[in-house]
Amino acid sequence: MDRCKHVGRLRLAQDHSILNPQKWHCVDCNTTESVWACLSCSHVACGRYIEEHALQHFKEQHHPLALEVNELYVYCYLCDDYVLNDNATGDLKLLRSTLSAIKSQCYEVTTRSGRTLRSSSANGDQLSPSTQELQLRDEDRMFTALWHRRRALIGRLFRLWFAQTERGKKRLEEERQQEEEEERKREARERRRQLKRQLKEELESAPPRKSHRIRRQSLKATSVKPARAPAKSTKSVRRRSAPARVSTPTPRTPRERTPQQRPRPQAKAKRPQAPPSKTGDSPVKRRPTVTPGVTGLRNLGNTCYMNSILQVLSHLHVFRECFLRLDLNQALELLASAVSRKLGLSAQRVIQPKGLNQGSGLSGGASRSRNMELIQPKEPSSKHISLCHELHTLFPVMWSGKWALVSPFAMLHSVWQLIPAFRGYAQQDAQEFLCELLDKVQHELERTRTLTPATVPANQRRLIKQVLSVVNTIFHGQLLSQVRCLACDHRSNTIEPFWDLSLEFPERYHSNSKDAAQVPCGLTEMLAKFTETEALEGAIYACDYCNNKRRRFCSKQVVLTEAQKQLMVHKLPHVLRLHLKRFRWSGRNHREKIGVHVQFEQELNMEPYCCKDSGNLPHPQHFLYQLSAVVMHHGKGFGSGHYTAFCYNTEGGFWVHCNDSKLSVCAVEEVCKAQAYILFYTQRNAQDKSKESDL
């Protein structure tokens, strides 16, 4: 619509909630796909093709204008059309330019009138990252407290309801009888303890027995009689009786000692007794109120791609355990000092006091790094930011069993600094982020190991080497590329590494046919297509066997023949990543999403897709894989959408649907019905080894 009369009445507030990237999701269903922000209030909800929460808000509040956060379209519900015009002050144009600046993190926005509209949550000048992180941490505490309060109320209501049922009454009667039995046992133990204390006090306060008095008198008599003997015999008797005289105080029994000589039992008797508990004397261990791993990650502004990948990596047992043990604080400090020496920062020697010990203090050289930061420029250097350190910090919080929600602000800040392609609040691809993240983590570990081999402690060097080995091998596999010449039947083999398998859909799904979109596709069919034999177009292959008799100085041309090519798996990784290429080209430059459902099973046998010509065939158990995680893309296109993940929780033995801050337990049948984008399968042999290491 060229002219909408409702836009002229628009009065946009300076501090609208749409300027906060953390609000770019539906407040009802938490999706980031097709999110519309009301221009009359701070409400943000999903469009009519998702759950119609924005339309429902219009029906309740009668606010006609809404703006799509990602595409920046303005829609009027009263006119039932898109709006093309603007108001007199140009608020819509200014709002679009401000949102574009927030997404790209470029805040140089100017207007003809000089008016600016800034985002208080995304502008680095008004709100530093540390202050924003503190605000998010307070919100996380409040969310966790509300979660605990809600769970306690639900548990109390359930217990009240259960107490009214027949089964509940029976259980309460059994618990009451058990408590009475425990109370009787406790009273009996208390009576025995009291009787024992009384006997001890009576024995301590009673005079020594007659037998002991007679024995002491006899000992004194024997020690006095030798004094009347001659001098020679007296010396000999004294030598024999001296040990007896020294050892006489030592054989005293507790009955002979006075209360002044036994302060410990008296103090122990005066020690106040703890109040008895209803369940007995054994202390009850307090369980974590949140299951480890069931911790949501706050959406900081179209960061669902990062949250889904972090949830998957944290639920991979081998990957998680490595970063839980890894601590690169000391290594990073040494790395920073090495970098500063390379840059020629000689001013550091002048700033540091002469008597300062670099290794003194509990921080182990924190003063050195603090002084080094004083002479560095204000812009943070990417060499001092570590994704490994952020993973080591984030994973323990997610698996502590204490937090229901965590804001990964530090992780996002590190990603912005180290991977500039993901800087800003624009929507990104989860597969690309996973590849870039693993590549940066691998390079960090390699740089840490090579630059500081002698200064890092031996145990840390071994741990860094182990983690690097796990990161390099957990997703690493090998492909066998085999080309067969059709003229001489000679086969040329090439080994190529891979970290994931990008599987294409069959040809029938690359058309706009509605019948093909309704028929589901199987994962085994896509794997068979990946490993099928394909014919090279025309005579384009220069066979080595056909041209081996030709010399380099020969003037004859190289013989080109027809050939066939096939890809097969030569070495399987511990964790198999299957990337489903859900796009097709429509026209020259337009990509569409293939929204067909892919049928995948909980167990996967990779033996049909591995090469069988190699002499060292692995054990049949190595071909079996178990489903560990699924990343899903919700939406019709690649320019917009929402990412969630299904992850298998090894601690609880159940599946969890991770939708940013909202996590819910689900069944495996629901997982298999998901529209998968990335599949993670863990080798069953590797799972058994991880379980044995835990035991």
UniProtKB/Swiss-Prot annotation:
Residues 198-294 are annotated as: Disordered. It comes from the Eukaryota. A zinc finger (UBP-type) spans 2-99. Zn(2+) 1 binds at C4, H6, C76, C79. The keyword Hydrolase applies. SUPFAM superfamilies: Cysteine proteinases, RING/U-box. Its EC number is 3.4.19.12. GO terms for cellular component: cytoplasm; nucleus. It catalyses: Thiol-dependent hydrolysis of ester, thioester, amide, peptide and isopeptide bonds formed by the C-terminal Gly of ubiquitin (a 76-residue protein attached to proteins as an intracellular targeting signal). InterPro entries: Papain-like_cys_pep_sf, Peptidase_C19_UCH, Ub_carboxyl-term_hydrolase, USP_CS, USP_dom, Znf_RING/FYVE/PHD, Znf_UBP. Residues 295-684 form the USP domain. It is found in: Nucleus. Its main location: nucleus. Zn(2+) 2 binds at C26, C29, C46, H53. Residues 209-218 have a biased composition (Basic residues). It holds the Pfam family UCH. The active site is at C304, H642. GO terms for biological process: cell division; central nervous system morphogenesis; cranial skeletal system development; negative regulation of ubiquitin protein ligase activity; protein deubiquitination; proteolysis. Keywords: Cell cycle, Cell division, Hydrolase, Metal-binding, Mitosis, Nucleus, Protease, Thiol protease, Ubl conjugation pathway, Zinc, Zinc-finger. GO terms for molecular function: cysteine-type deubiquitinase activity; zinc ion binding. Deubiquitinase that plays a key role in the spindle assembly checkpoint by preventing premature anaphase onset. Acts by specifically mediating deubiquitination of cdc20, a negative regulator of the anaphase promoting complex/cyclosome (APC/C). Belongs to the peptidase C19 family. USP44 subfamily. This is Ubiquitin carboxyl-terminal hydrolase 44. It comes from Danio rerio.
